[in-house]
Amino acid sequence: MSSSKPVTPRNDRRQNSGRRHSHRSSGIQLPSMSPKVHHYPIDAENLPMDSPEIVEKFASLAESMETLDLHMHDLCHIHDHISNQFNESFASFLYGLSMTMWCVDFPGCPSREQWEALISKRERKERIEVLKKRLADAQKLNDRLKLRLSDEAKQKPQQLTSQQRPTHGPTRQIKQQPRSVNFNTHSSDSISTNSYTSGDFNTNRRVSRIPQPSRSNLPSSRFQAPSKSGPNLNQPPRYMRGLFDGNNTLNTSNYSRIKKPIHNRSVNNLQNRPPFR
């Protein structure tokens, strides 16, 4: 059976390739079929892959490949030993530990001294912030106290000037001297009463602006009037004395002989009184 596919002539391909090679070897520049693509000029002395940047990149890539090959060889060696010489649970633990050891890397991890220095620096910053806040609060309190002190200093002179103004002259209270009444009797069986004092029963005290003379020269026999708030319970029994004598008779014969009370009240001399103002 004959194939339905046409046979590709091989001779033509060889001839075309040879012709193309012959054209290039002759130095003839073929026109570019894609004018948008930039082609480097062919220079035997300055090739694009021989530039220093490309050479450095290839050197770094070669070193990385060597390191990767070494790590993979060591990892395969560790995996083989763990899988063949340990049990399954412990082998899985060591396998995960080895994977973590090989895969996780912290090149920028700080040391212990650097970490402690970082923590102390952070604490110093926080302390500085707290001190700044306390200083601001103290400054505000100081300003408020200064303002309050200035207000009080302004109010004090006004109070002093108002207190220094004379309102009225000094007032003195007049104390009325009590009157002493003596009832003297001649006979022993008659009604006799001791001296009693009667003061002014007016509860309203008078206030005078006239300065009064000194009362230090009053006789010592006079004593102060009893209290106005209640009765005088220290009075002698005047009313019941003589009612019940030896003969149980009421003796009223001596009432006619009662003398008038003698007023020992000293009369103030008008000449000693200061002039009226």
Curated annotation (Swiss-Prot):
Pfam families in alphabetical order: DASH_Dam1
Predominant place of localization: nucleus
GO biological processes: attachment of spindle microtubules to kinetochore; cell division; filamentous growth; mitotic sister chromatid biorientation; mitotic spindle organization; protein transport along microtubule to mitotic spindle pole body
Compartments (UniProt record): Nucleus; Cytoplasm, Cytoskeleton, Spindle; Chromosome, Centromere, Kinetochore
Residues annotated as transmembrane: none
Region (Disordered): 1-36, 147-242
Domain of life: Eukaryota
Coiled-coil residue windows: 119-156
Alphabetized UniProt keyword annotations: Cell cycle, Cell division, Centromere, Chromosome, Chromosome partition, Coiled coil, Cytoplasm, Cytoskeleton, Kinetochore, Microtubule, Mitosis, Nucleus
UniProt GO cellular component terms: cytoplasm; DASH complex; kinetochore; mitotic spindle polar microtubule; mitotic spindle pole body
Compositional bias (Polar residues): 156-166, 173-184, 199-235
Disruption-associated phenotype: Kinetochore declustering. Short mitotic spindle and an apparent absence of interpolar and cytoplasmic microtubules. Cell cycle arrest in mitosis with unseparated DNA. Inviable.
Low complexity bias: start-end ranges: 185-198
InterPro entries reported for this sequence: DASH_Dam1
UniProt family annotation: Belongs to the DASH complex DAM1 family.
Role: Component of the DASH complex that connects microtubules with kinetochores and couples microtubule depolymerisation to chromosome movement; it is involved in retrieving kinetochores to the spindle poles before their re-orientation on the spindle in early mitosis and allows microtubule depolymerization to pull chromosomes apart and resist detachment during anaphase.
Subunit structure: Component of the DASH complex consisting of ASK1, DAD1, DAD2, DAD3, DAD4, DAM1, DUO1, HSK3, SPC19 and SPC34, with a stoichiometry of one copy of each subunit per complex. Multiple DASH complexes oligomerize to form a ring that encircles spindle microtubules and organizes the rod-like NDC80 complexes of the outer kinetochore. DASH complex oligomerization strengthens microtubule attachments. Within the complex, DAM1 and DUO1 may form the microtubule connections. On cytoplasmic microtubules, DASH complexes appear to form patches instead of rings.
Protein's name in the database: DASH complex subunit DAM1
